[in-house]
């Protein structure tokens, strides 16, 4: 596998990591390992999904994280993916507490967002999330493999650069994840730390310190990320780092915007506008700074990061050697190009994300209202100031400076005068009394200059719970013009304020004045009745209902009704008032499918009882996830509520959710022991109900969630089925053993559960224990008499499984009990094999001490313990086995041997050890590769030098193991070694072979390097070793580079003297080689550099003909569209075949279409007289026949003549079938005659696409072919009647052949007898022009041009002054005439002849 495939198809040896008994894996590591076993346990992804599913879940706060974690675990086990293998390896051993912590952090984040009621913040958050959703997933996946990348590039020049990128990314990920889970106060404090995370991340875009920008620029500017060959591992790893770093850079930008937006919104909500302004400036500057770095500024993006990265990606994608890699690599490159292009477009398309405008604060304050102080917030001698801000729903805008303070003297509610805004924007007005929190007091329209600060006081008065004071103030303010509909924070009006405060006196007055607006929602969809219900103001609710307020109106986000809110709060009186409405829907569902009764579970037993007593209540209503109110009561550990629900005879205690989980399942998984006991005691509860699809009972869940107290209680219950088998035959005992629940296992044994229970794959509890990380369970089961020789369906014993899974302690315990270590499974595996492959030296020593000969045991793949130890890279085990006389030259079915394994890994010490102990240096695998070749291919120069200097083998020995690679001669090891070094791009090895050892002639190094696209090696050989770039053995380096599509190598060779038109093989040149493999970029370059497009190779083909015969559609199109002057589209080979013939032979319909649509002569016949259409018919190529039939009746493309007119008269289509070389010259006078008269007509739009010159020449051709001699004057009329008849008949037959091309043309439309008569008459009378008219008029059924236009055209074209005698035409002339007729037909095809042209 190449380096790029290793990076982009990243795989890890999960079993090796799972074997580490003493290492506790993190949640992320375990999730990753288990996903490799198809568990699909993606913790954070599942967490996000669950939060989306239960965002309105009516459960108490302390339960929410636990409940979400439980649901996440259910999703995990309910996926049906948990099999016995995962259970044994600890994948099922979910870190529940860690999941709970994750979920609680996620809910903290959600709570913060719900408290942030800012559209501007939402817009920035949406922008960030939209971009980050496409960036973050792959970026974090890339981050996981950086350890291996760093290890593989250790001691290289890019290592420090990649390390910086990796370190920055990990710091960013860790800190960002950590702060997201903080509660509000801690979150704000963390963000505002001096020189904390926000400061550090802002600095990361500067080219200093440990930032991110500098290392990315180094990779780009130094070209580290552009691979020179398929094996350029460093370049591919640098590319990986560049992509990861760039995605991190984008993530940092949007993370900063999110956090500063949050801070701005946070302080705006608190009314601390000065701090808000500070963070507003931060948002603006961050966006503009990062935008400049990412996409450039000032009209140039040449130095911008995203453009530079895109250029790198395009350069990598253009590498021809990518075609040898898996398609995933190309797909990845395309995805990254698309991703960064979209980000660039999105960022560049936004001028800014904050408003650039700040209104001037020209407020002039005067007190004109007769409202004496003290009144509301207006207190005598207090100072008041004002500030203004442009109103914007979607952009943050800056708040102006505060006005000079005005002292309150006797009056309240001043008038503010300000100039009309020049930007024609609405303006928000804020006021602040001394050091108190500022308040929004209103909005000024674009053309308003006076503003009375009175509406906020009305809103505040409405919110005053003191009935009399609030009412008195409202009355006074309304009398002075206050607007009761004025909106304030979140779009709430005085109606909302009164509903919340419960001031019935104020509310009554407002209701009377707002009858049409009682259902008006705020920005979150809360109406006045929502506000009243949420606060338990039953009187207000009643008042609103009396005045027809809607009782079923829903909020925007959660779609909750007033009844949901009242029920959640437990407001019984409010509930009663709502239920008095005849319109109430007691079972109305919110966004997640929860009814008010679900919400009532939080409100307590009294409100639940009220629901139960209400007719029509659906007591078993299910949410979208299938949860009933009874489920929620159990989840909340609230038995009084559950008991209240049980009073209803309709209650279904075994109701199941979408995973078939009953309330009992939830009680068990959440560890609610007392609730569980009460449920078990209910006669109607099904204690053995199972979930789907894994068929788990409550007992399974109790064990899985490690609720030992619950499990032990369940084991006491007689009706609990202790042996219930779930999917895969897994019983509770199997789960308890695999999860290491020793107390549970002991109790199960005590009550007599069968220890030999088997899964569907015949695993016993002891098998599972042997594979698990709990050796104490192994000991316990053995002590209880478990069968130590039991076999699985595959024939594995507990000991074999323990060794295969690397469980050394379990293996030693079993060996100590004298189990059969010779037992073999169906794969031929024995415990010694497992011990060897896992490096368990003590186990291997114990087994071999018992039976020394077992060291030679082979499994079904012919692997011995020694070979397995070598393949899994356990040097000490290898040395031990060699010391025990293991066959050092052992090979498995693939030919893998110990020496080869360590050569691949570059372990020189083990190479020396094995060779010194008799390893055969010539031993090769099934591909013929020995240890030396592997050292070469992997670039292990130390092993190569050791082998060469110590003369461990003969360099010149013929190697028959690779004879198929060298079929025509005996090739030595030296040949293959040098070839391999070049092919795999190991330049240090090449320098050693060619430079140090002077092996210039072995493997034609320069040709081989060019053949495999190894540019660095090509440069080295040309520049340092001065090899000839035109060496040919056979073919030059340029030929081979062109054939294989290595454009960079082709360019280098051409620039350094390679002859472009030099022969390769069979008379082909480099361009032929490139065309044959469809390398269009190489073809374009070679043409640009002078490749001869008219040269024919040994097969008689020009490059254009080669493109067609090679089915290289893109190249053929390139020649036709861009190089028409250098090719002949109608060229024929020695067999008379045209390009169209070849396209038909290869059944290439697309090529046929390209040629026909670009004017190829479809009537050309090959050496046996066949046209392309006839060949297609003979071969029954129906689609091509159908196409050619259709196209043959259409007018030849008009742009053909435009090409002919561009300086290439020799390419005129008429010249393809006429003998006269001077025909164009002979008629120049005709073409130039009467220019002014014809110019207007011929240049009219109707004739812009007509081949006029071709038609003019056609008439001449007809005449010349009729006479063979040229023009004869009218007086010479020596033709006999027989000759005229014969000529007329031949013309008519040719015309009939022309008509036969149109298979669907009704023959009755053309009377050939009449055509013959008219042609004969025209010939006999010498009226030559009428022949053309006769033939064209016969095609009138398909004509399109206006009659007048056709008549004018014909009169101009046929104005010739001669007649001609008729003779018998030879075949060649007849064929040419037929072609002429074909073109003539096309020139008439779109013509509608007027009656005046219907002759005789």
From Swiss-Prot:
Its main location: secreted. ANK repeats lie at residues 490-520, 524-553, 558-588, 592-621, 625-655, 659-689, 694-726, 728-757, 761-790, 794-823, 827-856, 861-890, 894-923, 927-957, 969-1001, 1002-1031, 1033-1062, 1066-1095, 1099-1129, 1135-1164, 1168-1197. It is found in: Secreted; Target cell membrane. The keyword Cell membrane does not apply. Residues 238-257 are annotated as: Helix H8 is the probable transmembrane region of the tetrameric pore inserted in the target cell membrane. This is Alpha-latrotoxin-Sg1a. PANTHER family: ANKYRIN REPEAT AND PROTEIN KINASE DOMAIN-CONTAINING PROTEIN (PTHR24198), ANKYRIN REPEAT-CONTAINING PROTEIN-RELATED (PTHR24198:SF165). It comes from Steatoda grossa. Belongs to the cationic peptide 01 (latrotoxin) family. 03 (alpha-latrotoxin) subfamily. Expressed in venom gland, cephalothorax, and abdomen tissues from both males and females. The H8 helix is predicted to insert into membranes and form pores by assembling into tetramers. The helix is contained within a helical bundle domain that undergoes significant conformational changes during pore formation to allow exposure of the H8 transmembrane helix and transition of the toxin from a soluble monomer to a transmembrane tetramer. Presynaptic neurotoxin that causes massive release of neurotransmitters from vertebrate (but not invertebrate) nerve terminals and endocrine cells via a complex mechanism involving activation of receptor(s) and toxin insertion into the plasma membrane with subsequent pore formation. Binds to neurexin-1-alpha (NRXN1) in a calcium dependent manner, adhesion G protein-coupled receptor L1 (ADGRL1, also termed latrophilin-1 and calcium-independent receptor of latrotoxin (CIRL)), and receptor-type tyrosine-protein phosphatase S (PTPRS), also termed PTP sigma.
């Amino acid at each position: 596998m190449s380096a790029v495939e290793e990076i982009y198809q990243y795989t890890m040896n999960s079993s090796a990591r799972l074997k580490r008994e003493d290492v506790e894996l993190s949640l992320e590591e375990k999730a990753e390992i288990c996903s490799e076993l198809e568990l699909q346990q993606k913790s954070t992804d599942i967490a996000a999904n669950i939060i989306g599913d239960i965002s309105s879940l009516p459960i108490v706060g302390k339960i929410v994280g636990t409940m979400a974690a439980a649901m996440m675990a259910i999703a995990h086990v309910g996926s049906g993916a948990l099999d016995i293998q995962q259970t044994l390896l600890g994948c099922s051993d979910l870190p529940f507490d860690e999941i709970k912590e994750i979920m609680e952090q996620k809910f903290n984040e959600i709570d913060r967002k719900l408290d942030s009621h800012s559209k501007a913040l939402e817009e920035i958050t949406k922008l960030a999330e939209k971009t980050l959703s496409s960036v973050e997933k792959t970026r974090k996946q890339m981050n996981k493999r950086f350890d291996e990348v760093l290890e593989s590039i250790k001691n290289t020049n890019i290592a420090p650069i990649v390390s910086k990128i990796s370190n920055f990314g990990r710091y960013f990920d860790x800190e960002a994840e950590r702060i997201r889970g903080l509660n509000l106060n801690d979150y704000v404090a963390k963000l505002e730390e001096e020189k904390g995370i926000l400061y550090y991340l802002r600095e990361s875009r500067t080219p200093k310190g440990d930032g991110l920008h500098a290392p990315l620029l180094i990779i780009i500017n130094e070209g580290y990320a552009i691979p020179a060959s398929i094996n350029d591992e460093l370049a591919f790893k640098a590319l990986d780092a560049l992509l990861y770093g760039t995605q991190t850079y984008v993530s940092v930008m949007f993370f900063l915007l999110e956090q500063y937006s949050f801070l701005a919104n946070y302080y705006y909500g608190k009314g601390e506008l000065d701090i808000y302004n500070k963070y507003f400036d931060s948002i603006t500057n961050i966006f503009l700074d990062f935008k400049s770095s990412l996409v450039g500024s000032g009209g140039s993006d040449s130095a911008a990061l995203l453009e530079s990265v895109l250029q790198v990606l395009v350069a990598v994608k253009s590498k021809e050697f990518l075609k040898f890699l898996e398609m995933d690599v190309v797909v990845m490159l395309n995805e990254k190009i698309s991703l960064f292009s979209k980000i660039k477009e999105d960022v560049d398309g936004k001028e800014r994300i904050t408003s650039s405008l700040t209104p001037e604060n020209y407020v002039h304050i005067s007190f004109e209202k007769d409202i004496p102080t003290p009144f509301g917030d207006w207190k005598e001698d207090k100072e008041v100031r004002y500030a203004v801000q442009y109103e914007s729903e979607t952009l943050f805008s800056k708040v102006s400076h505060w006005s000079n303070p005005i002292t309150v003297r006797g009056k309240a509610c001043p008038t503010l005068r300000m100039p009309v805004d020049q930007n024609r924007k609405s303006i928000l007005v804020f006021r602040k009394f001394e050091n108190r929190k500022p308040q929004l007091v209103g909005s000024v329209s674009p053309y308003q200059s006076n503003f009375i600060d009175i509406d906020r006081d009305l809103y505040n008065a409405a919110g005053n719970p003191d009935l009399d004071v609030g009412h008195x103030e409202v009355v006074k303010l309304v009398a002075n013009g206050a607007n009761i509909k004025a909106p304030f924070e979140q779009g709430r009006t005085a109606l909302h304020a009164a509903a919340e405060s419960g001031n019935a006196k104020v509310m009554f007055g407002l209701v009377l004045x707002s009858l049409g607006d009682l259902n008006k929602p705020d920005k979150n969809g809360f109406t006045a009745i929502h506000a009243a219900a949420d606060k338990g103001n039953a009187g207000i609710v009643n008042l609103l209902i009396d005045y027809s307020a809607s009782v079923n109106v829903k909020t925007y986000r959660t779609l909750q009704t007033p009844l949901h809110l009242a029920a959640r709060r437990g407001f019984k009186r409010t509930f009663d008032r709502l239920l008095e409405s005849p319109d109430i829907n007691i079972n109305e569902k919110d966004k997640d499918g929860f009814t008010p009764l679900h919400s009532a579970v939080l409100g307590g037993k009294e409100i639940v009882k009220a629901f139960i007593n209400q007719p029509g209540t659906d007591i078993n209503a299910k949410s979208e996830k299938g949860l009933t109110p009874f489920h929620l009561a159990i989840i909340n550990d609230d038995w009084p509520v559950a008991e209240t629900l049980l009073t209803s005879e309709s209650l279904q205690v075994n109701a199941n959710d979408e995973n078939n989980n009953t309330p009992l399942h939830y009680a068990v998984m959440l560890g609610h022991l007392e609730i569980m006991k009460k449920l078990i005691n209910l006669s109607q509860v099904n204690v053995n109900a199972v979930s789907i699809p894994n068929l788990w009972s409550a007992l399974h869940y109790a064990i899985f969630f490690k609720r030992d107290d619950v499990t032990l209680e369940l084991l006491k219950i007689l009706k609990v089925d202790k042996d219930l088998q779930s999917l895969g035959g897994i019983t509770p005992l199997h789960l308890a053993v695999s999860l290491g629940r020793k107390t549970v296992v002991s109790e199960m044994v005590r009550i007599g559960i069968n220890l030999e229970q088997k899964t569907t794959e015949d695993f016993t509890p002891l098998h599972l224990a042997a594979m698990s990380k709990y050796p104490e369970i192994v000991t316990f089961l053995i002590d209880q008499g478990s069968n130590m020789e039991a076999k699985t369906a595959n024939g594995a014993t507990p000991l074999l499984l323990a060794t295969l899974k690397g469980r050394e302690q379990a293996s030693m315990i079993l060996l100590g009990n004298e189990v059969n270590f010779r037992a073999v499974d169906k794969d031929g595996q024995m415990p010694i094999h497992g011990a060897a492959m896992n490096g368990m030296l003590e186990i291997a020593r114990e087994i071999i001490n018992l039976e020394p000969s077992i060291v030679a045991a082979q499994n079904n793949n012919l692997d011995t313990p020694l070979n397995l130890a070598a393949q899994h890279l356990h040097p000490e085990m290898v040395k031990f086995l060699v010391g025990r006389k293991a066959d050092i030259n052992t090979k498995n079915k693939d030919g893998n041997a110990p020496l080869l394994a360590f050569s691949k890994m570059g372990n020189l010490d083990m190479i020396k050890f094995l060779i010194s102990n008799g390893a055969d240096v010539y031993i090769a695998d099934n591909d013929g590769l020995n240890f030396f070749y592997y050292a070469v291919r992997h670039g292990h120069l130390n092993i190569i030098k050791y082998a060469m200097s110590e003369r461990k083998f003969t360099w010149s020995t013929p190697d028959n193991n690779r004879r198929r690679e060298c079929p025509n001669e005996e090739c030595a090891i030296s040949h293959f070694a040098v070839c391999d070094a070049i092919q795999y791009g190991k330049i240090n090895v090449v320098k050693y072979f060619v430079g140090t050892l002077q092996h210039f002639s072995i493997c034609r190094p320069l040709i081989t390097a060019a053949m495999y696209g190894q540019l660095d090696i090509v440069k080295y050989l040309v520049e340092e070793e001065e090899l000839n770039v035109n060496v040919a053995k056979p073919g030059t380096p340029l030929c081979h580079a062109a054939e294989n599509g290595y454009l960079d190598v082709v360019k280098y060779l051409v620039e350094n003297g390679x002859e472009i038109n030099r022969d390769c093989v069979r008379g082909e040149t480099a361009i032929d080689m490139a065309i044959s493999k469809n390398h269009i970029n190489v073809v374009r370059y070679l043409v640009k550099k002078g490749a001869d497009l008219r040269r024919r190779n040994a097969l008689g083909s020009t490059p254009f003909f080669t493109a067609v015969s090679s089915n290289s559609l893109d190249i053929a199109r390139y020649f036709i569209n861009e190089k028409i002057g250098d090719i002949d589209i109608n060229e024929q080979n020695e067999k008379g075949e045209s390009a169209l013939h070849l396209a038909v032979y290869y059944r290439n319909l697309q090529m046929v279409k390209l040629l026909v649509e670009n004017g190829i002569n479809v009537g050309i016949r090959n050496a046996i007289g066949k046209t392309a259409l006839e060949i297609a018919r003979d071969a029954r190529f129906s689609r091509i026949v159908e196409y050619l039939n259709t196209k043959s009746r259409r007018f030849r493309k008009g742009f053909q003549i435009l090409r002919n007119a561009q300086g290439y008269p020799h390419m005129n289509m008429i010249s393809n079938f006429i003998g006269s070389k001077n025909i164009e010259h002979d008629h120049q006078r005709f073409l130039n005659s009467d220019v002014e008269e014809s110019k207007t007509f011929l240049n009219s739009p109707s004739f812009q696409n007509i081949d006029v010159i071709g038609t003019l020449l056609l008439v001449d051709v007809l005449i010349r072919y009729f006479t063979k001699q040229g023009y004869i004057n009218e007086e010479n009329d020596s033709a006999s009647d027989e000759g005229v008849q014969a000529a007329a008949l031949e013309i008519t037959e040719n015309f009939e052949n022309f008509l036969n091309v149109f298979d669907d043309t009704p023959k009755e439309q053309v009377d050939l007898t009449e055509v013959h008569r008219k042609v004969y008459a025209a010939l006999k009378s010498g009226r030559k022009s009428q022949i053309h008219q006769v033939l064209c008029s016969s095609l009138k059924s398909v004509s399109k041009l206006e009659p007048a236009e056709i008549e004018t055209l014909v009169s101009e074209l046929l104005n010739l002054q001669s007649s001609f005698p008729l003779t018998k035409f030879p075949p060649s002339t007849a064929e040419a005439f037929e072609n002429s007729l074909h073109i003539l037909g096309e020139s008439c095809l779109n013509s509608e002849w007027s009656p005046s042209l219907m002759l005789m």
